[in-house]
Amino acid sequence: MPFNIDINGHLLHYATVQPLYILKNKVPTYVFLSHPATASELVFSAGQLKKVMMDGRPVKNTGDKYLLKCGQEKEHLIVLSAVNGRQTKILLLTQEQARRSWKIQKGNEDLLCITSSQVIPSSEEITVRNVDRNQFEMQIYPADSRWKVREGISVKKRKQGEFQVIRFEVPAVPLQVSCRKEQNPDSYVPQQPVYPEDNRLKETPESCPGPQYFVNFKPVPSSLYYAVSVPQLPVSVKNAYLMIDYTGDTGALYNKGALIADDYYWGGPMMFDTGRMKRQGSQEYLLQIIPFAPEVNIYLDPSVRKKLELSSQGVRSIRIAPVYDVKFDRPAG
């Protein structure tokens, strides 16, 4: 990528790496990512540079330039030392690291977190969240051993290069959901409409693709029905997702006769956030699956269409995926 860009007073003539973030700390860090199919190179003007280090080793200038060649399989740290003593850091990430990276602010410091978990920062703490996975790993730059994990067990911390690596887990919470075929869907029709009546589909023939369900439950010929019961969540789990693996044109989920979620088949599970409902004990739902017509005249990704079996439509499996939240912080100073 030919460009002339100022990096804290140093001229970057060109680079084959992609800019990501600037961590505006006392010693700023410019974060870039390497592309797997491209040799990673950066060329700096030597004008204001006294010394360049890459991964702890000095780099020699070539005339009036510094040429840095970096492998794409690991991260690299480049330290630029100016003639006036000012330092600038460049952190080069792999593509996978960049994909899982988060820039967050803690106090007056910018941090880089690399994790497959969701990161929810606040001024007081950082929350990391996993769905259906009770094991966590965080890589934090700059490295700092003072990070403390709340509620975590089996906490292991170590320094790896420029990162502080923290691994921990929380107790797994097994949750069982019951699902049975419903032979009498008429019993789920609400006595009074919960929502204004939806008659858009009144004249739609069953052979047409697309949704054939309603905001207020009404049985639809050829549909498959399942009674689903979700248990009360324990105190340690604040939320959970209902994961419905099915085959069919559409899926529709009802609670007390009202449509609460729908899904067009795409090859993956239908997900429903149970936290959307007021939880007072267990929850009962009716799941409606409308099968595909014999001719599926809609676009599906080739990999999905290849696996589509019209002879076995309906629910394949249904489970509860708990949401695990863990908070961790670092003492000030």
Regions found by a protein language model. Give the residues of each.
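Non-catalytic C-terminal accessory domains or segments of carbohydrate-active enzymes
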Residues: 1-333
